Amino acid sequence: MNTLRAAIVPGLIAGVVSIFASWFWMGFVFHRYQRATPETWRPEGPRNYALSSLVRVLSAIAISVLYVLVARFHVSFFADGMVGALRFAAAIWIALAAPVAIEAAIYVRMHSMVVLGQVIDWLTTAVLACAVTFVWTAA
């Protein structure tokens, strides 16, 4: 099975689940901190939610594809079962998502708890993408 075929379904599953996880983190747990910097945020609406959901699903698919590529080449640190999948999720998160959120907060006025929420939110997406992909490809 080729890499994209092996990763697309688990990536879609993880992406859809991560939309709800994102709602939990950013829409429920950390949303109240956005009020500290109201001038930073655009008005929210259905279009915003649809676009951010699309970004979330595509990101989960991309992470799944990268994980399948790395696991298939038996990179020992990342090919060690579920633990390896979680290591890969952490590496992707540390390399991409966390620095983007943290660096944006340096230049854009955001409450520190919103930044923490974004970082946790993207860690959740990376973990879901890698864990679901591992379970899917191991079956």
Task: Tell me the role of every PLM-derived stretch.
Residues 1-139:
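Juxtamembrane/disordered regions of integral membrane proteins
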